[in-house]
Regions:
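Eukaryotic N-terminal low-complexity, Ser/Thr- and Lys/Arg-rich leader segments
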Residues: 1, 118, 177-180
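Hydrophobic ligand-binding cavity/cleft-lining segments
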Residues: 1-57
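Short structural boundary motif marking the start of a folded domain
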Residues: 1-2, 131-133
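Hydrophobic-ligand binding "helix-grip"
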Residues: 31, 35, 40-42, 65-132, ...
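A conserved amphipathic terminal alpha-helix motif
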Residues: 141-180
Length: 180
């Protein structure tokens, strides 16, 4: 299991969540992602979709291909989204991973600060210290083959922070493009 936390200033939870669920764009900006596409709805697992929509969450499935130095893996993920708080992707078909769950959580910095009893201050950039989003990213996985487990563990140490940075950069580039 690997996790990373980052404060992203000047962005909204909604904008960050939108980029995370835009799976069709992943190959253009996500490290280690060779291809990604939302699959046609008629191929989705009906029970998983029903469970998600019953909870008021969005649901879709996506095929992804990831590559890390010596190996690559194609798999399908079942994705649920509770906008704008959380996006969770669970691998439902993979040869390499027995299980893999990726979770993104987005919390307004002002909410996180008030939960911790912190007072609002200026951040030195002209923004209140509470203007931003706390992004928590977590990858929890179990590898089928013990031989591959050691290699995957080494690589995944860097994946969590690289993922957050890539998504933050994507959100900022989309925001700049929208301003033009």
């Amino acid at each position: 299991r690997y996790a990373a936390r980052k404060i992203v200033r000047g962005m909204t939870r909604e904008a960050l969540c939108d980029v995370v669920v835009d799976v069709d764009s992943y190959a253009s900006f996500v490290p280690f992602c060779a291809s990604a596409a939302v699959t046609p709805r008629e191929t989705w697992e009906v029970a998983r979709e029903r469970d998600a929509t019953t909870r008021g969450e969005e649901y879709f499935e996506a095929d992804l291909e990831i590559g890390f130095k010596v190996f690559s893996e194609r798999y399908t993920s079942a994705v649920t989204c509770a906008r704008p708080e959380r996006v969770t992707a669970r691998s439902v078909s993979s040869g390499l991973f027995k299980s893999m769950t990726t979770t993104w959580r987005f919390q307004n910095l002002s909410d996180a600060a008030s939960e911790e009893g912190e007072e609002e201050e200026d951040d030195g950039l002209g923004l209140p210290a509470s203007d931003g989003v706390v992004v928590d990213f977590e990858i929890d996985f179990e590898v089928n083959d013990p031989v591959h487990a050691a290699a995957v563990s080494v690589v995944f140490k860097d994946v969590a922070s690289a993922q957050i940075s890539a998504f933050e950069k994507r959100v900022r580039s989309l925001a700049l493009a929208a301003m033009r």
